Structure formats: C-alpha cells, structure tokens
C-alpha cells in the first residue's frame, strides 16, 4: 500500500521533470505519455523510470546538439479521452519537440491526429519496433542503472528497453537536425526521424 502511495506521488511530481535546467544550455522538452494510474500503471512506471534514466544519461554526457533535455511526463490512464487531453496539452507547448507514448492501441490512435495536426513527432510505443521486450535479455549494466533510478530498486519491465531506445533515437534525431538545418524544431526533428535507424538495446529502431 505504501509503495503504491509513493509511486502515485512520484507520478504527480513527474508531470514536469526537468533534467539539467540549471545549465546555461537551452532546454528542449520531450513528452512522455503513459498510464501512471489504473490497471496498466505498471507500463507507465516502467516507461517513466526508463525515460528518466535515458534523459539523465544524455544530460550527464553534456546534452545533445547544444541542448539539455527535459522530460514532461503526463498520465493518460490508458483512457482515450485523457490521452486526447494529454496530447493537446503537449501540442500547445512550443517547447515540446517530440513525444513518446501512449503504449496502448486506443489512446495512441486517438492522440495521433492531434500530434500530426500540430507537427509534433510521435514515437508510438506499443507499435513495432517498440513492442514489449523481454527485460531478462537486457544488458546487466542497464538493469542496474534502471534499478538505481527507481524508489525501491525495481526490476525493469517489458517496456523499459523500448522506451530507452525511443529516447536514444530522439537523441540521434536532435543531433542530426542541428547538423543538417542548424536548428532543433519539430519539423527538423520529424525530418531527421524519417531518415534514421538506430541500433538500440532491443535491436534496430526507427520511426514507424
């Protein structure tokens, strides 16, 4: 019971998780939408911990393309209407460059047109190649690092690897966008994602 309460508080606090905001480097925001409450909450926490790890590692290494990353995590509870609201909230924030979500078919289907209409790149977790991946086959170093960012040294779940790889693909897209266009925008990142393939922990990933 106490663990559940702590997790709920962490999810609420994670609505806006800023990584490295004390840096003088400009910040770009990555949206993460997942079910942090309800019957699919384990998916949400698996995603949150993995995304948090990936963003921390990128920022600790100096960021990407002259930017630090900030993770904006929103709960859609696996509910289509909440997914629609979360997508709209992220879409109107000009600082949000891309979104990783929504992990479940119906919320993703509902949210996708909102991102498209506003030019927000979406990496749709839950669709190939970002389907559940056996965490027992992930490198031990990743599993240890994942446990270290959780409140109770928890074990990585089936969406840990795919989420980590999605952030890794975004890192590459940000770098390519800056290199090819001299700027990091929704449009330049979308174009870069369309060209990229990235070898991650779970295999080759790309924008489906």
Segments (PLM) and residue ranges:
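Extracytosolic ligand-binding ectodomains
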Residues: 2-4, 8-15, 20-208
């Amino acid at each position: 019971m106490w663990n559940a309460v702590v997790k709920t508080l962490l999810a609420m606090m994670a609505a806006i998780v800023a990584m490295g905001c004390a840096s003088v480097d400009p910040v770009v925001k990555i949206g993460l939408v997942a079910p942090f409450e309800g019957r699919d909450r384990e998916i949400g926490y698996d995603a949150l911990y993995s995304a948090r790890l990936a963003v921390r590692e990128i920022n600790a290494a100096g960021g990407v393309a002259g930017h630090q990353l900030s993770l904006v995590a929103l709960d859609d509870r696996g509910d289509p209407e909440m997914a629609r609201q979360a997508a709209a909230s992220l879409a109107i924030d000009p600082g949000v460059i891309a979104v990783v979500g929504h992990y479940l078919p119906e919320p993703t289907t509902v949210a996708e047109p909102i991102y498209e209409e506003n030019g927000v790149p979406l990496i749709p977790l839950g669709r190939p190649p970002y389907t559940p991946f056996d965490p027992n086959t992930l490198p031990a170093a990743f599993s240890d690092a994942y446990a270290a960012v959780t409140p109770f040294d928890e074990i990585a779940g089936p969406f840990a690897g795919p989420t980590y790889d999605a952030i890794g693909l975004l890192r590459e897209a940000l770098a390519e966008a800056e290199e090819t266009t001299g700027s990091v925008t929704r449009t330049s990142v979308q174009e870069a994602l369309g060209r990229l393939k990235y070898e991650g922990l779970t295999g080759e990933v790309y924008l489906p």
